[in-house]
Regions:
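Short, charged helix-capping/linker segments at alpha-helix termini
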Residues: 3-14, 24-43, 145
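C-terminal edge and immediately downstream basic/flexible tail or linker adjoining helix-turn-helix-like DNA-binding
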Residues: 3, 87, 108, 139-142, ...
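N-terminal module of bacterial RNA polymerase sigma factors
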Residues: 1-22, 114, 176-190
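A short pre-motif secondary-structure segment
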Residues: 123-127
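Internal acidic/polar
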Residues: 75, 82-106, 177-187
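Sigma70-family region 2
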Residues: 5-6, 32, 43-60, 79-81
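Hydrophobic-face residues of short alpha-helical interaction/recognition segments
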Residues: 23, 27, 52, 65, ...
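DNA-recognition helix of helix-turn-helix
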Residues: 70, 74, 120, 141-168
Length: 190
């Protein structure tokens, strides 16, 4: 980043190669929308170049980059109407039964993550999917380390509750309205 800050624009390509996948995953886990995530990644790297002089050498680049990412996302939300649709590209109402168990679990986890309130989803994505340290997250969010720990704990608890409800709903849909093992209309056990 020091070379980009010093005016060596070619080094931005190196930063892009190093960080664009992580940024895309960050945005995609927050929004569930592929095209929006790609646009936001481009916007972040444009801003890194534009605001390169604001980077303080010796501070964590990743924390600075994720702060820019948060700002880019907030700016996008402000530009759009207040009731932006954050519907994921895959419907959570249907979990394909022919998927392997691990794929179904991953689908339910993604769905549960998108069901979390935005603030809780963001802190989980930063800590669990982007592997940032709590100290870095505190810097990004502008809060105390202890606050980050509490937020992560509460977000994990709520994620677990949502996941369990989704999993229970999947089992109910699989069993049907009569319950497991009962054929509709026959009263006999299958």
């Amino acid at each position: 980043m020091a070379q980009v800050r010093g005016g060596v624009g070619e080094m931005l390509g190196t930063l892009f190669e190093r960080h664009h996948v992580a940024l895309f995953n960050f945005f995609y886990k927050l929004t569930g929308q592929r095209a929006m995530s790609e646009d936001l990644v481009q916007d972040v790297f444009f801003r890194i170049l534009k605001y390169r002089q604001s980077y303080r050498p010796g501070t964590g680049f990743r924390a600075w980059m994720y702060q820019i990412a948060r700002n880019a996302r907030v700016d996008l939300l402000r530009r759009q109407h207040p009731e932006i649709s954050w519907e994921p590209e895959m419907s959570p109402a249907f979990v394909p039964e022919d998927q392997p168990q691990q794929d179904q679990q991953a689908f339910l986890l993604r769905t549960a993550l998108l069901e979390l309130p935005e603030e809780k989803r963001e802190v989980l994505v930063l800590s669990r999917f982007q592997d940032l340290k709590y100290e870095q997250i505190a810097e990004i969010l502008g809060c105390e380390l202890s606050t980050v720990k509490v937020k992560v704990h509460r977000a994990l608890h709520e994620l677990r509750d949502i996941f369990q409800k989704l999993e229970a709903g999947k089992l109910l849909r699989k069993a049907g309205p009569q319950g497991p093992g009962i054929r509709p209309g026959s009263g006999s056990v299958q």
